[in-house]
Amino acid sequence: MIIKITNELSYNTDSEALLLLDKEIGYVNISLYDNQAKMYIFIEEEYRFHKYATLSLNALIKEYLKKDNVDRIVFYVEGSSRPGLNLMGKLNVYYVYFDEETNEHVYAVDKDYLANENKKEKEYFDTYDINMNKVDFVWERGKKYPSSLYHIVVSVLLINKDQKILVTLRNPSKTHPLCYEITTGSVLKGETPRQGAVREVKEEVGIDLKESDLIEFGRAVIEDMHVLAYVAFIDFDESHIILDENEVIDYTLLTFNEFAQIIEHKDFHPLNRKIINKSKKKLNEIISRHFAS
C-alpha cells in the first residue's frame, strides 16, 4: 500500500500545523510539509525528556485514531536520523522516499515487517534512578515509564588484530534508520551490563565474546539512558560476521582514521557519537596500550 504526501495543510494550533491525519483502509494517511516534520523531529530530539512538549500533539493524533484503535505511528522523513513520531502501543511503520517520476514524497507500508514485528516476544528492562541505583519498576518496551527513570544501554567497539573496527548499518525499520553504528542495545531485565553487551554482539553480528573481553571506556547519562561503552579486542575477520538483518543490514571494517571520520558523519548514530567523543581520550589510551604490548 502506497500513501502519497500532499501539500495541503490546514491548522488552528501549532500541533495541527505539524501534520494532518486522514483515514485510509485501516492504515493512517499522513499529510505534512517536509520542513514542518523536520521541525517536529528537532523538537523531539532536543526535548525528549520533557513529556509535556508533545502532549497536545499526541492528544490530537489519538483523537484521529481512536475509532480504529491504533495508537502508534512511526514515520520517517527523508534525510532524518530518527522517527518523526513515536506514540506508545501498536506498531505501524511508514518508509518515506522521493518519487522522481511524480515529484512527490511517498510513504510505503512494509507489511512483512509489521507482521514480524507483531510476532516478537515482549521485552522487559530494569530501570534505574539518575545515580544508576536500581528501582522497583520494570519497563516493557513500547510502554511509557516515569520521566525520572532510566534504563541501561550498552555500546561495544569491536577491534580485530588488523586494527580494524567493525561498523554496521542499521535496518531502515529501526530508530535512526540506515545510520552507521557500533553494536548497541538495551540491557534486558535481570542482565548485567556486560551480559547484555555479550548478548547484543552475538545477536547482531554473530561474534562470540566473553565478559572478560570487555573493557569499559566510558559512561554517560543521555536522555533516558545510562549508556555504558566498551571496547573489545577480538581475533575476528569477515568470515566470523553473521548479521541479524532485522537489526543491521550491512557492515564494514574501518581503519582508525576512517572511523574517526565516520563518527562525525551526519548518518553516524548520535548516541554512539556522544559517548565516543565524551570518552575519546580514555578510549585512545586503551587502544594505544593494547597495540603497544
For the regions a language model picked out, list residue spans one by one:
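Conserved acetyl-CoA-binding loop-helix of GNAT-fold acetyltransferases
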Residues: 49-63, 86, 193-196
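Conserved GNAT acetyl-CoA-binding A-motif
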Residues: 36, 66-78
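A short, internal acetyl-CoA/4′-phosphopantetheine-binding micro-motif in the GNAT/acyltransferase core
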Residues: 40-50, 78, 186-189
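The catalytic Nudix box helix
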Residues: 166-167, 182-215
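Acidic, metal-coordinating catalytic segment for phosphate/diphosphate chemistry
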Residues: 116-155, 161
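Acetyl-CoA-dependent GNAT
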Residues: 3-38
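Conserved active-site alpha-helix within GNAT-family acetyltransferase domains
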Residues: 79-97
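Nudix hydrolase/Nudix homology domain
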Residues: 178, 216-293
